[in-house]
C-alpha cells in the first residue's frame, strides 16, 4: 500500500532532478563552444627531450650518435664563433696575482673584473711602471641599466664607504703604479652623484703619491655641470667621460637618463673649468652605427676640444644584453684611428679589444700630461704615425 507521504513527495523530487540534469547538460554545451582552443606552449627543454633519444635508443647503444654537443656545434657554426682577433690568453703572472690579492685584501672593486674586461691580463700583468688598474669607487652596483653593461644594478645601492678614499690611496701607493684610473658606477641616489667622494679620493692619492698620474672616468651627474667642475678641480690629470655610441643609437644603447648632448656638456665643462686637463671619451662599435654617424661624433668631440678618444668592439656580456650587430674588422679600427688623429685628437687607441682605460698610462699620453702640467713647450701629437693614405685623402 502506498502511503500518502510518499505520493506527496514524488512529484516535487522528480521534476527537480530532471531540471538539474537538463540545466547541467545545456550549460556544459555552451561552455564547450565558448572555450577558445589554446595551443601547447613550446619549451626548449621539453622539445629537446621529445626530439632526443628514447629509452630504447639508450638500451641499444644508439644514443651517443643522436646527441649533439653544444660546444662542438658552436665550433662547426662560424656564426656562433667569435672572430679570432677577439680571443685573448688567460690572465696570469706575478704582477697580476699581486694586484688581485691587494684588491681583495682592501675590499676594492675594479671595473676590470666587474665589467669582464678582456684586457685584464695585459693591464694587470705589466711591469709596475706600465701596469694600469682601474678602481671602481662607490660600490659595484649602479643605479642605471645600460643595455651593453654587465655591472649590477639597483635603485638603492649601499651607501659609499667613507674609508674608501683612504683605502684606495693606500693601495695605489703600495702598488707603485705610474698611472691609475678611477671609475665609478652611476649614483643617481646621491645628491651630488658622488662628485665629492671622487674628488676626495683624488686628493688622498695625490697626498700619498704625488708622482702618480690620475685619470677619473666619471658619470654625467644627471647633467649637473657644477658637479663636473668640482671633479675637474680635484687635482686629477685626465677627465674621462664615455659617450659610448653615436647620437642616433644613444636612446637604444644607454639608460634613458643618459643623453648624447648631456655627455658632451660634461666634457665641455671639464675643459672650460681647467683648460690644461686632458679630456677623454670612448666609443664602442658594433651596434649598427654608420660611418657618417661616427664621423659626426668625432666632429662634435673636436668642437668641445676633446683630446683623447678610444674605439673598441662591443661584446655582448650575457643573453640579457643587446645583440652584436656586426664584428668590426681590425682594418676598420685602424682607419678610425688614423682618421681621428688627422682630425686633431692628441691620442687615439683603436682596436677590437680596446676599452676606455686600455693602456691609459702609455708613455705618450704621460708625456702630454706632464708637459701640460708644467706648461713646457708645445703639446706633442701622434701625427707622425698617421697613415699617409688618410692624410692624402683629406688634402
From Swiss-Prot:
Its cofactor is [4Fe-4S] cluster. [4Fe-4S] cluster 1 binds at residues 112, 117, 123, 357. The keyword Cell inner membrane does not apply. It is found in: Mitochondrion. Residues 1-14 form a transit peptide. One of its GO terms (cellular component) is mitochondrion. NCBIfam families: lipA, PRK05481.1, PRK12928.1. Belongs to the radical SAM superfamily. Lipoyl synthase family. This is Lipoyl synthase, mitochondrial.
